[in-house]
A protein has these predicted regions:
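Cytosolic juxtamembrane N-terminal segment immediately preceding the first transmembrane helix
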Residues: 1-32, 48
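Extracellular/periplasmic helix-loop-helix junction of adjacent transmembrane segments
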Residues: 42-70, 110, 305-309
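Hydrophobic transmembrane-helix bundles of small-molecule transporters
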Residues: 169-277, 281-284, 310
Length: 466
């Protein structure tokens, strides 16, 4: 069986093995973000069962994000050294175990510890995940498979709250953890006969100084973003995080086997500007579903289920078209396709900034579908451009860096919304502050529109430089 699973020294798998690996990674690409975003709807049920405070419950969400952000960059290098499949498989086992244990949590403290651990072990999956896909398939298929992976990730992020809402309402919040753990076991089964291994820097030593510096700097930055409305505390944490990240960059520039090889950015504008465009894209779009949920439920008056169905228009279009956009980027310059997608997304976000309580729902639906199309045209081709801009030995680092850009962008997006809601003095979501809330939503979309214009600039500069 082992001999049938690999065909050459380049690591390209035969069709049967490649299909199994592809399905395993796509399943995991869905279920990780699905669990990460879906648990949000279970917060009230958790509070009721455990009698937990709002502060304790906030760590159910933030702990997961913190664990992911801390380890996702170092694990990419770890996978390059010890083997991408090996690290990925270990991550799957740990991910399944921590979620199955989460279903048995007896206190909010136990759950918070498990959520942090879930975030940590998810980095073992998302760090080498895309590198594993790209390493095992021919270069001519790279855009297509990245498209399916991106579609799966976005679908998980968007559909998590909807599906988990039903699980929580009709079964229990524990079923979310149970279902997630069991689904991950499917990926483990699909990978069990694949023995081929992929390395990027086999036998290299681990960059301890750089890794420790990043493990300290990343959470400081994220904590600063989460406390941006707390005045000096938030800005002090942000400043400390920024200094730490600059120190991390300096350490990496001197290291023999760096956690992040900063030389990848030197003379490589496609890689540099594609990563910056990715971070700005996530910064401008991640809060979309949150803002639209507030708009549709509080401003317009739809039920939660109806609002969820309307919001699903965006990820459905995105998931349906991402593979086609990825395949298109195999034939046309990826940066060009991504630039068109980012321009469409920017136009859609600016359109959202003009929404009022009387806007016809069909216009809202069209805007969501338009943004979904922009998502598809940007995400997969941009990821393709990033992975195509580095040598095979750097696939693990590139994959982890892209995941880091996603997490940083997501955190920034929610920090912007939190700050705007506070500045607009939105104190109630029961209808009393609808004027202020609508104003905050409009301002947020205008800011995100400006951020997306910056992303267009990064994308165009990349194309010109190339």
């Amino acid at each position: 069986m082992e001999d049938k699973m690999k065909i050459d020294t380049e690591g390209i798998l035969d069709k049967a093995a490649a299909r199994r690996l592809f399905v395993a990674v796509v399943i995991t690409s869905f279920i990780g973000p699905f669990a990460g975003s879906g648990i949000n709807v279970a917060i009230p049920a958790l509070g009721q069962e455990f009698g937990a405070s709002a502060g304790e419950l906030s760590w159910v969400v933030f702990g997961f994000l913190l664990g992911s952000a801390m380890f996702i960059l170092p694990t990419g290098k770890l996978a390059d050294i010890y083997g991408r499949r090996r690290v990925y498989t270990i991550g799957l086992w740990l991910f399944a175990s921590t979620f199955l244990l989460g279903a048995c949590a007896t206190s909010v403290a136990m759950l918070n510890v498990l959520r942090f651990l879930q975030g940590c072990v998810m980095s073992l999956i998302f760090g080498p995940g895309m590198a594993l896909l790209v390493s095992s398939h021919e270069a001519s298929q790279r855009g297509r498979i990245i498209g399916y992976s991106a579609a799966s990730t976005y679908s998980g992020l968007s559909m998590g709250p909807v599906i988990c809402g039903f699980l929580c309402e009709y079964l229990s919040w524990r079923s979310i953890f149970l279902v997630t753990g069991l689904v991950v076991l499917i990926s483990i089964y699909l990978l069990k006969d694949i023995k081929q291994e992929w390395y990027g820097d086999k036998g290299a030593s681990i960059d301890k100084k750089g890794s420790i510096c990043y493990l300290v700097a990343a959470p400081l930055w994220l904590c600063g973003l989460s406390k941006i409305t707390d005045g000096s505390t938030g800005f002090l944490l942000l400043g400390a995080g920024a200094v730490g990240l600059l120190l991390f960059w300096w350490i990496e520039s001197k290291a023999e086997h760096p956690c992040l090889d900063v030389r990848l950015f030197h003379g490589n504008p496609v890689f540099t500007f594609s990563n910056l465009a990715a971070m700005l894209h996530y910064s401008s779009t991640f809060a979309l579903s949150f803002l639209m949920s507030l708009y549709l439920q509080v401003i317009v008056g739809y039920t939660a289920s109806m609002a969820g169905m309307i919001i699903l228009l965006q990820p459905v279009v995105m998931a349906a078209l991402s593979p086609k956009a990825g395949a298109l980027s195999d034939r046309i310059q990826p940066g060009l396709v991504a630039s068109v997608g980012m321009t469409m997304t920017a136009a859609g976000l600016w359109g959202m900034s003009f929404l009022t309580g009387d806007t016809p729902i069909w216009i809202v639906g069209l805007l969501l579908m338009w943004i979904g199309l922009g998502f598809a045209l940007f995400s997969s081709p941009n990821n393709n451009a990033i992975m195509g801009a580095v040598e095979k030995k750097h696939y693990g680092t590139a994959s982890s860096l892209l995941a880091t850009m996603r997490l940083m962008g997501q955190s920034t997006s929610m920090a912007v919304v939190t700050m705007i809601i506070a500045l607009c003095q939105v104190h109630s979501l029961t209808g009393e502050d609808n004027v202020q809330l609508l104003g905050a939503i409009q301002i947020a979309f205008r800011i995100f529109g400006c951020i997306s214009i910056a992303a267009i600039f990064m994308s165009l500069v990349r194309n010109k430089a190339k």
